[in-house]
Amino acid sequence: MGMTITEKILCRHTDLDEVRPGMLINAKVDIALGNDVTAPLAIDEFRKAGGKKVFDRDKVVLIPDHFTPNKDINSAAQCKIMRDFAREQEITHYYEVGEVGVEHALLPEKGIVLPGDLVIGADSHTCTYGALGAFATGVGSTDLAAAMLTGEVWFKVPESIRFVLSGTLNPWVSGKDLILYIIGKIGVDGALYKAMEFTGDTIASLTMADRFTIANMAIEAGGKNGIFTPDEITEAYVKPRAKRPYTFYASDPDAAYAQVIEIDVNRIEPQVAFPHLPSNTKGISEVGQVPLDQVVIGSCTNGRIEDLRAAAAVLKGRKADPRVRLIVIPATQEIYRMAMKEGLFDIFLDANAAISTPTCGPCLGGHMGILAAGERALATTNRNFVGRMGHPRSEVYLSNPAVAAASAVLGRIAGPDELK
């Protein structure tokens, strides 16, 4: 019996000839990632374990993105721990404020993560890199510490669910809508500890930005990882960025799956996730009247240049409702520069938006857009749990960037088709 793409990548990072779901394995990592929230804990554990030098300074990546630029003394202390460690260890891939971006947008952009890689990160949305055809998953800080010390980490090989997407996307429908629809269909535990493998004829029409968004939110269905088979679109993205060899893997025709789920995308309209779970989804036509206090466009889910272009196309010549605070956060400095050169910032500023330097900021209730009790936000982020963006009595809704932009203009959740 053949292996899935996830099983193949895991196997190639061991000394085994094959792996099967349920096996416990030790695997070598290509990238071990930490951020300003999780890395300080890992550094402490690394030192407690007697660590003097990381296993490979080129493979340990440290990104201060969650509370940067630092919002307070505690966040400054967290970043200083990581910064000092990066300098001490001569870490190749440490990016300071002014150069840093939201980690899961920055690493692919820099060519740090490549197809066929095995990536662990002390951040649950590390699964984003599956869009490139890599095995990528989130771990705890102690596992990151072990990886920094040894270059290895243990896994239980996951079963795989194959999602077969067929058909053509409707207007204003993006990768965000596909993954929200899937999560709404299977639930937040519908893929618990399983690889979510995305296939079907629709995939060829998806941009890399769409694929990153879909893989990013695999964890919201409980997935161990999300993954795409690399193709010509992947190659076009990776080739100019890669500074080392990479490998394209694909599932064998006779690979075994725990489940196969077929999705007809022709039937999907823009989706909105209602509080307080990403699975609590409705089509835009079913939303009703939901007034808003804030709209956030950005994050590791939807802060790429394609996302900003989609929002700008809707906002051009329009202004945000005066009752709505509109915040736009490009995910990296490169995206920031591209948006500026393309005139997107003029559109955002004319719409009365606040434009931020790259940061995770409001997504995790960190800073740059915290909600008060009773306030309601629509965000292009990935989670809408109780208190996710501020007060426990606030509400967060999730959508794609075009819907977010239209909603900012109308002051309520709405699709772009409602604009005149």
UniProtKB/Swiss-Prot annotation:
<comment type="subunit">
    <text>Heterodimer of LeuC and LeuD.</text>
</comment>
<feature type="binding site">
    <location>
        <position position="360"/>
    </location>
    <ligand>
        <name>[4Fe-4S] cluster</name>
    </ligand>
</feature>
<comment type="function">
    <text>Catalyzes the isomerization between 2-isopropylmalate and 3-isopropylmalate, via the formation of 2-isopropylmaleate.</text>
</comment>
<comment type="pathway">
    <text>Amino-acid biosynthesis; L-leucine biosynthesis; L-leucine from 3-methyl-2-oxobutanoate: step 2/4.</text>
</comment>
<dbReference type="InterPro" id="IPR036008">
    <property type="entry name" value="Aconitase_4Fe-4S_dom"/>
</dbReference>
<dbReference type="InterPro" id="IPR015931">
    <property type="entry name" value="Acnase/IPM_dHydase_lsu_aba_1/3"/>
</dbReference>
<dbReference type="InterPro" id="IPR006251">
    <property type="entry name" value="Homoacnase/IPMdehydase_lsu"/>
</dbReference>
<keyword id="KW-0408">Iron</keyword>
<feature type="binding site">
    <location>
        <position position="300"/>
    </location>
    <ligand>
        <name>[4Fe-4S] cluster</name>
    </ligand>
</feature>
<keyword id="KW-0456">Lyase</keyword>
<dbReference type="InterPro" id="IPR033941">
    <property type="entry name" value="IPMI_cat"/>
</dbReference>
<dbReference type="InterPro" id="IPR018136">
    <property type="entry name" value="Aconitase_4Fe-4S_BS"/>
</dbReference>
<dbReference type="InterPro" id="IPR011826">
    <property type="entry name" value="HAcnase/IPMdehydase_lsu_prok"/>
</dbReference>
<dbReference type="GO" id="GO:0051539">
    <property type="term" value="F:4 iron, 4 sulfur cluster binding"/>
</dbReference>
<comment type="similarity">
    <text>Belongs to the aconitase/IPM isomerase family. LeuC type 2 subfamily.</text>
</comment>
<keyword id="KW-0004">4Fe-4S</keyword>
<keyword id="KW-0432">Leucine biosynthesis</keyword>
<dbReference type="GO" id="GO:0046872">
    <property type="term" value="F:metal ion binding"/>
</dbReference>
<dbReference type="GO" id="GO:0009098">
    <property type="term" value="P:L-leucine biosynthetic process"/>
</dbReference>
<feature type="binding site">
    <location>
        <position position="363"/>
    </location>
    <ligand>
        <name>[4Fe-4S] cluster</name>
    </ligand>
</feature>
<dbReference type="GO" id="GO:0003861">
    <property type="term" value="F:3-isopropylmalate dehydratase activity"/>
</dbReference>
<keyword id="KW-0028">Amino-acid biosynthesis</keyword>
<protein>
    <recommendedName>
        <fullName>3-isopropylmalate dehydratase large subunit</fullName>
        <ecNumber>4.2.1.33</ecNumber>
    </recommendedName>
</protein>
<dbReference type="Pfam" id="PF00330">
    <property type="entry name" value="Aconitase"/>
</dbReference>
<dbReference type="InterPro" id="IPR011823">
    <property type="entry name" value="IsopropMal_deHydtase_lsu_bac"/>
</dbReference>
<keyword id="KW-0411">Iron-sulfur</keyword>
<dbReference type="InterPro" id="IPR001030">
    <property type="entry name" value="Acoase/IPM_deHydtase_lsu_aba"/>
</dbReference>
<keyword id="KW-0479">Metal-binding</keyword>
<dbReference type="InterPro" id="IPR050067">
    <property type="entry name" value="IPM_dehydratase_rel_enz"/>
</dbReference>
<keyword id="KW-0100">Branched-chain amino acid biosynthesis</keyword>
